């Protein structure tokens, strides 16, 4: 879901993976990136144990951002296709993302089955404040449509909030700390419990230097107090 990530963009949909290279006279509004991760973690939830590839393309102009992103485990255990749009003004971002999970047998998928009772899409609305003068961010999100249902088939409106802080040691070395919690009984606790802390994350980012080339890398420690689980992941980022 991501973003799933990460890190990708918008603190779970708000971080932009940057390419390190020669500057051009005029930047293109289009971008493309690739993340290689040792496993897929998102908001304290483990989506599989296999290394996962996250390709992404984006378009950004005058505060408007649109993206398409995939998530593919190398053992075939997970597939994901995400689309999203957002708008940023100063320190505030609002957006909508659509997360879709194809089955392992592609011909059985019905991407355009959009009836709220039957669709496999998960549609989320979110708002983010990211400080300009202070390195803090706050994100609140809610699933507003799609497969986020309870056993009775009713929309759960699973909601999540996250508070984070970033500290930069140097231009290429920083650490991000965040705490996230589900706000109601829903997806993040398997519809078993209301408010709970489900994600405590410490992420260190740096760049490996090879002459004039820099390869962004990160290492993350993730703790989910609700599930009593902890994880460690590493990622490489390539800007295209």
What function would you assign to each model-found segment?
Residues 1-29:
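Cleavable N-terminal export/targeting peptides
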Residues 34-40, 63-74, 94-102, 109-111, ...:
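Transmembrane beta-strand segments that form the barrel wall of outer-membrane beta-barrel proteins
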Residues 28, 49-53, 60, 77-81, ...:
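Residues that define the transmembrane beta-barrel architecture of outer-membrane proteins
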Residues 113-186:
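Detector for outer-membrane/organellar transmembrane beta-barrel domains
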Residues 174-210:
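Outer membrane beta-barrel transmembrane domains
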Residues 22-29, 95, 130-135, 168-175, ...:
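Short loop/turn motifs that connect adjacent beta-strands in outer-membrane beta-barrel proteins
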Residues 202, 206-208, 228-240:
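Outer-membrane beta-barrel "beta-signal"
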Residues 22-73:
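Short glycine/proline- and aromatic-enriched beta-strand/turn motifs that initiate or cap beta-hairpins
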């Amino acid at each position: 879901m991501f973003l799933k990530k990460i890190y990708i963009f918008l603190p779970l949909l708000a971080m932009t993976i940057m390419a390190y290279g020669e500057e051009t006279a005029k930047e293109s509004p289009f971008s493309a990136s690739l993340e290689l991760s040792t496993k897929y973690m998102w908001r304290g939830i483990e989506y599989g144990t296999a290394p996962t590839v996250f390709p992404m393309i984006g378009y950004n102009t005058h505060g408007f951002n649109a993206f398409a992103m995939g998530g593919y485990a190398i053992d075939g255990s997970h597939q994901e296709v995400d689309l999203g749009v957002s708008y940023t003004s100063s320190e505030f971002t609002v957006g909508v993302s659509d997360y879709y999970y194809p089955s392992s047998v592609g011909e059985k998928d019905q991407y355009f089955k959009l009836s709220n009772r039957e669709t496999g899409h998960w549609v989320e609305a979110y708002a983010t404040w990211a400080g300009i003068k202070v390195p803090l961010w706050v994100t609140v999100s809610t699933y507003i449509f799609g497969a986020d249902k309870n056993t009775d088939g009713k929309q759960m409106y699973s909601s999540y909030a996250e508070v984070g802080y970033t500290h930069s040691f140097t231009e290429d070395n920083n650490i991000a700390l965040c705490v996230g919690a589900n706000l109601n009984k829903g997806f993040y606790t398997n519809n078993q419990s209301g408010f709970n802390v489900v994600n405590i994350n410490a992420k260190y980012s740096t760049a490996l230097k090879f002459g004039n080339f820099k390869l962004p890398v990160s290492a993350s420690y993730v703790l989910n107090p609700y599930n009593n689980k902890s994880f460690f992941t590493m990622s490489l980022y390539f800007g295209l």
